[in-house]
């Protein structure tokens, strides 16, 4: 409670200082100044006691030619037990002593930080803001106000300072929601993710336990900080190590600063593109910033629906060369949404479970928030489907929580939390829990960008009340019940879909369902029907022959550089065209009465006899061109079936259809089917799979297709495996439409209201 009062007091004070920026800055831009200054003031207070001694030691080391800058930094940090230091002559107080040179001195003060601190602080690009404040004649006023805040660690402990900073980051980001939404996850969503991640995990209570947490898209570090707080609240003696990677400079600076001002290690937060581009440069990590590292817990909010074209070549190369020895073995999603690449990346960093050859109690848990696309986008055999298949068949998908819409600052779409783990509890093995949290929403008093709803968090900071949706959803996850229902009154929501009609509080909604892993898999079978054609030689069909590629290509020369040879080839082709047309014209009278030949073999004999002895002859290409559908042949359901050389029916591509058939109820997972990749050139042996599923598919055909299309058959060579999670379909419940009398009465009521309003105008 003492920490909470302290952080509220200081946070409000800093928030009020931001009003000094009004004019040169718009409110959404205040964070550009106030967040870096808060960090600098905390660092200034932390270094105050050792400042003089550090300066003396630094000067002494610089006088020696034996030490380079890296060695000097190591000596000073070790000697004074510091993670960073500052070698400038200035502090916040002494900066104010020279108002005329404040801007220049502040820049020198920033340059005086040791390299590890500068790596973070430089990403704020604060020099631009110093110049802007100086030009607006606000710099002295702002620095004076910030210098008056006492953030000394003796009076503001690290934990309280963490609360202050996180609160400021949240408030400034909410104020700048239009700009910050891409990399700022709402606090209550993070809390729910953390709760679900650690729900039922006994290892977090082990004294002295080393727990490694990772976020590959860590943004401002909210998920890492919330995870650490959750663990330390339950187990103060736990040893938590935080790892992250971020490519937005300001977000990286905020995340690193959060750790720095709490006295924690910052070198495990790296700056760079997690997926990788293959175009690395100094100071930027290109690709995996923590190679060969594994983590116990991982969280992420990858960008929604953002294309990964800049990373395409690098990622595709890794997929093709390394397969499952790299990060992206299961497949690549379509270029317009790379979210599933991040999940594959996280799974590559899992701690092996005991079943995977790891230590007893090993394994990892992942919480990641996606939009709806990763649930179902991608047909059978596509990259997205194969990634889902890989995860589900390995029994790693534990739960999916469908959140309310309008929770995020920069999008109103519905979002979903995936819980993925290679150490499921015994009761969850082979199962996936879907949780419908769509009604667990609390309407906000004031919208923040697209965010109009939030998850209720219980008692609020200002003493108000919200239902505790986070705890309720955590319990639903822990209860692990099938077909669990709750009354609207028990959910406690103030969202009314219909403004004129209150929700029935006694109505129950489905909130939890359990599924077997195989329930999400299906076989995409290709259903063929035979090619049936009638044939005739008529003017219209001859015109179709003339428009065909075989006929037109006869008069096109391939000898482009040999003009003489080209002309001769074209002339020869035109002669062949004329000969074909002449022969067909000779056959026309036979069909003047509308006669049709409904057997292809019979018609072929007729044509073969007509072309016998001609210059062009009866070649295979000519045969194919003339007998094709859309040439002399036309589709006819009454015609005989066209057979191939082996006597098998030929399929009609225009009648081809596909059916998605659920997997057999008793089929073991994983399926005996390799993933298509560069090594097997997309060709995989399906024989074992077909042996297990052939009769199941034939039974489906007999039940669902043959009663309507008796000549249909399955082309098993085209069979593909798909996986999808049709979340909304599983929670859809039919509601009968309102009685017509009720609708009519409402229309009449609205008409009366409109007439009353019009009468007031007139």
Residue map of PLM features:
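Non-catalytic, mostly N-terminal accessory regions of nucleic-acid modification and defense proteins
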Residues: 1-201, 270, 274-277, 402-405, ...
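Short acidic (Asp/Glu) and glycine-rich catalytic loops that position anionic groups and cofactors
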Residues: 143-144, 173, 265-276, 320-326, ...
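Conserved S-adenosyl-L-methionine
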Residues: 183-300, 304-317, 340, 371-373, ...
């Amino acid at each position: 409670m003492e920490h909470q009062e302290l952080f509220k007091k200081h946070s409000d004070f800093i928030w009020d200082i931001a009003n000094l920026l009004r004019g040169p800055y718009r409110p959404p831009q205040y964070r550009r100044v106030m967040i870096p200054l808060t960090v600098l003031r905390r660092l200034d207070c932390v270094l105050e006691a050792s400042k003089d001694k550090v300066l003396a030691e630094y000067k002494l080391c610089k006088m020696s030619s034996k030490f380079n800058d890296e060695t000097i930094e190591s000596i000073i940090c070790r000697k004074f037990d510091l993670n960073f230091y500052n070698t400038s002559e200035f502090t916040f107080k002494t900066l104010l002593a020279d108002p005329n040179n404040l801007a220049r001195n502040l820049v020198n003060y920033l340059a005086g930080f040791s390299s590890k601190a500068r790596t973070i602080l430089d990403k704020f690009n604060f020099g631009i803001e110093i110049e802007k404040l100086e030009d607006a004649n606000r710099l002295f006023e702002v620095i004076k106000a910030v210098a008056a805040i006492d953030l000394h660690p003796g009076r503001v402990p690290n934990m309280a300072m963490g609360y202050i900073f996180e609160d400021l980051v949240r408030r400034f980001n909410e104020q700048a929601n239009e700009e910050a939404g891409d990399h700022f996850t709402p606090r209550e969503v993070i809390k729910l993710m953390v709760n679900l991640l650690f729900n039922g995990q006994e290892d977090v209570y082990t004294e002295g336990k080393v727990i490694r947490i990772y976020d590959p898209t860590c943004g401002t570090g909210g998920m890492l900080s919330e995870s650490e707080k959750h663990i330390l609240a339950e187990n103060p003696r736990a040893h938590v190590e935080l790892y992250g990677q971020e490519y937005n400079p300001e977000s990286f600076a905020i995340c690193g600063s959060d750790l720095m001002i709490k006295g924690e290690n910052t070198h495990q937060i790296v700056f760079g593109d997690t997926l990788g581009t293959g175009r690395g440069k100094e100071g930027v990590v290109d690709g995996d910033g923590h190679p060969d590292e594994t983590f116990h817990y991982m969280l992420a909010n990858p960008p929604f629906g953002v294309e990964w074209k800049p990373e395409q070549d690098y990622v595709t190369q890794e997929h093709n060369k390394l397969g499952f020895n790299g990060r992206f073995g299961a497949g690549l999603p379509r270029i317009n949404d790379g979210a599933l690449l991040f999940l594959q990346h996280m799974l590559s960093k899992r701690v092996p479970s005991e079943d995977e050859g790891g230590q007893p109690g090993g394994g990892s848990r992942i919480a990641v928030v996606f939009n709806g696309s990763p649930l179902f986008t991608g047909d059978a055999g596509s990259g997205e489907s194969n990634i889902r298949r890989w995860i589900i068949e390995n029994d790693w998908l534990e739960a999916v929580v469908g959140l309310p819409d309008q929770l995020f600052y920069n999008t109103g779409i519905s979002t979903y939390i995936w819980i993925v783990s290679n150490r499921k509890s015994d009761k969850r093995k082979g199962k996936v829990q879907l949780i419908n949290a769509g009604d667990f929403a609390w309407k906000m008093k004031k919208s923040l960008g697209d965010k109009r709803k939030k998850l209720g968090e219980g008692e609020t900071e200002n003493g108000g009340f919200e239902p505790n949706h986070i705890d309720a959803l955590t319990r639903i996850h822990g209860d692990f019940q099938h077909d669990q229902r709750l009354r609207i009154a028990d959910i406690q929501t103030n969202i009314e879909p219909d403004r004129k009609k209150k929700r029935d509080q006694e109505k129950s909604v489905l909130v939890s369902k359990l599924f077997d892993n195989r329930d999400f898999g299906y076989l995409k079978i290709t259903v063929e029907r035979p090619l049936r054609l009638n044939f005739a030689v008529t003017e219209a069909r001859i015109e179709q022959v003339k428009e065909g590629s075989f006929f037109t290509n006869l008069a096109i020369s391939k000898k482009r550089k040999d003009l003489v040879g080209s002309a001769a080839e074209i002339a020869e082709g035109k002669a062949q065209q004329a000969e074909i047309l002449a022969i067909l014209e000779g056959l026309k009278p036979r069909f003047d009465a509308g006669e049709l030949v409904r057997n292809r073999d019979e018609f072929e004999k007729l044509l073969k006899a007509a072309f016998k002895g001609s210059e062009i002859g009866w070649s295979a290409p000519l045969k194919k061109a003339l007998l094709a559908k859309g040439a002399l042949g036309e589709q006819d359901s009454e015609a005989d079936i066209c057979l191939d050389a082996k006597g098998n029916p030929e399929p009609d591509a225009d009648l081809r259809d596909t059916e998605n058939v659920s997997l057999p109820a008793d089929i073991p997972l994983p399926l005996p089917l390799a993933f298509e990749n560069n090594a097997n050139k997309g060709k995989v042996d399906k024989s074992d799979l077909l042996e297990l599923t052939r009769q199941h598919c034939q039974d489906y055909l007999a039940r669902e297709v043959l009663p309507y299309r008796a000549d249909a058959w399955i082309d098993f060579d085209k069979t593909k495996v798909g996986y999808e999670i049709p979340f909304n379909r599983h929670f859809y419940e039919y509601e009968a439409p309102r009685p017509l009398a009720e609708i009519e009465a409402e229309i009449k009521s609205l008409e009366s209201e409109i007439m009353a309003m019009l009468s007031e105008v007139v």
